[in-house]
Swiss-Prot record:
Presence of keyword RNA-binding: yes
Purpose of the protein: Binds together with bS18 to 16S ribosomal RNA.
Family, similarity comment: Belongs to the bacterial ribosomal protein bS6 family.
Full protein name: Small ribosomal subunit protein bS6
TM regions (residue ranges): none
Pfam families registered for this protein in UniProt: Ribosomal_S6
Keywords, ordered alphabetically: Ribonucleoprotein, Ribosomal protein, RNA-binding, rRNA-binding
GO molecular function terms noted in the UniProt entry: small ribosomal subunit rRNA binding; structural constituent of ribosome
CDD domains linked: bS6
PROSITE patterns, per the entry: RIBOSOMAL_S6
GO biological process, one term: translation
Length: 95
């Protein structure tokens, strides 16, 4: 198993109180495949460096997790299919 860091930018029209429960629903994929979620850090609404889908802001969340590579690929696929997710970036950690 490898360590990964996933950055997720969510639609700013979403209520910030619903971010944690919706992320938890996505992270259930990792838990089902015997992976672990070490940390979920929700940064809140931030200004984007450039517009994405004509939006100037996004809700940032960073997730540190440990899982197999196939699991993180499936998580990225499911996140990209969701309309409330504007952008994702998966980085392999150095743990």
């Amino acid at each position: 198993m490898r360590h990964y860091e996933v950055m997720i930018i969510l639609d700013p029209s979403q209520d910030e109180r619903t971010v944690a429960p919706s992320l938890d629903k996505f992270l259930e994929i990792v838990r089902k495949e015997n992976g672990t979620v070490e940390k979920v850090d929700i940064w809140g609404k931030r200004r984007l460096a450039y517009p994405i889908a004509k939006k100037e802001e996004g809700i940032y969340a960073v997730v540190n997790l440990t899982c197999e590579s196939a699991t993180v690929l499936e998580l990225d696929r499911v996140l990209n299919l969701n309309d409330s997710v504007m952008r994702t970036k998966v980085l392999r950690g150095d743990k």
